[in-house]
Amino acid sequence: MSNNMRKLFSMIADSKDKKEKLIESLQENELLSTDEKKKIIDQIKTMHDFFKQMHTNKGALDKVLRNYMKDYRAVIKSIGVDKFKKVYRLLESETMELLHAIAENPNFLFSKFDRSILGIFLPFFSKPIMFKMSIREMDSQIELYGTKLPLLKLFVMTDEEMNFYANLKTIEQYNDYVRDLLMKFDLEKYMKEKGV
């Protein structure tokens, strides 16, 4: 199993998804139309621009945090603005890497399964999600992103993956490939090896 897919699965695993649930979700895959792919890319670009604004424009970050947080003052006092800036800088970089991966190989968004990738970015993009978080939950999310995400390099594809996506023709081929990777993947062993 390639390193990049392992990294992706480890992030998905952090969201409490079970291997069986992931395999089951593959049954629901269908080909993406050009319009659907464009919509996803637009979503990623919107996220990227938002994340960039958050760490380059102090006023914009302050306004968003005031608007997105239940208790703005307590969050800033407990966590601090610098941690948010660091995470938003990191997320800008990751969304750019994702856009580069898609540009290099459009089939990277071949399946609806790949939409789960966007979930990685949602906690720091979605007001409803951020608003529901306690200070402790927000701090732990910042810690997760700040320590794990830089190690994973999610969207740097190996030659094997580039070749696979370039030659991908059918959804069945994709399902078989990912199902095989999931069945072979040992999360506990991987996490232990990486010290994650």
From Swiss-Prot:
Origin superkingdom: Bacteria
Effect after changing D14N: In strain: NCTC 11638
A Pfam short name: CagS
The protein, known as: CAG pathogenicity island protein 13
Gene from which this protein is expressed: cagS
